[in-house]
Design a protein with these regions (language model features):
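Polyanion-binding surface elements
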Residues: 2-28
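Helix-turn-helix/winged-helix DNA-binding modules
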Residues: 7-8, 32, 43
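Short amphipathic alpha-helix starts
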Residues: 26-27, 46, 51
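Residue-level detection of the helix-turn-helix DNA-binding "recognition helix"
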Residues: 31-32, 56
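Short Lys/Arg-enriched helix C-cap and helix-to-coil transition segments
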Residues: 38-44
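A short, Lys/Arg-enriched interface patch at domain edges and termini
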Residues: 49-63
């Protein structure tokens, strides 16, 4: 039997640190791109695996 470990949600600040950008950049990406962000109440939350896949896809570039 395989065990699946649930991935934790991270905050917008943690997402910015993970990607090496400012929080304002993350906010701009939320408005202008399809960054995998999930609004939970008033807060934006992210999954590291989704962010990494998004960056690898090349969609993080803003024209």
């Amino acid at each position: 039997m395989s065990q699946q470990i649930a991935e934790n949600w991270i905050s917008i600040t943690e997402a910015a640190i993970h990607l090496g950008v400012k929080v304002d950049t993350i906010r701009a990406w939320i408005k202008k791109t399809d960054i995998p962000a999930h609004k939970i109440g008033k807060l934006w939350k992210f999954k590291i695996s989704e962010l990494d896949a998004w960056v690898k896809s090349g969609k993080s570039a803003i024209d």
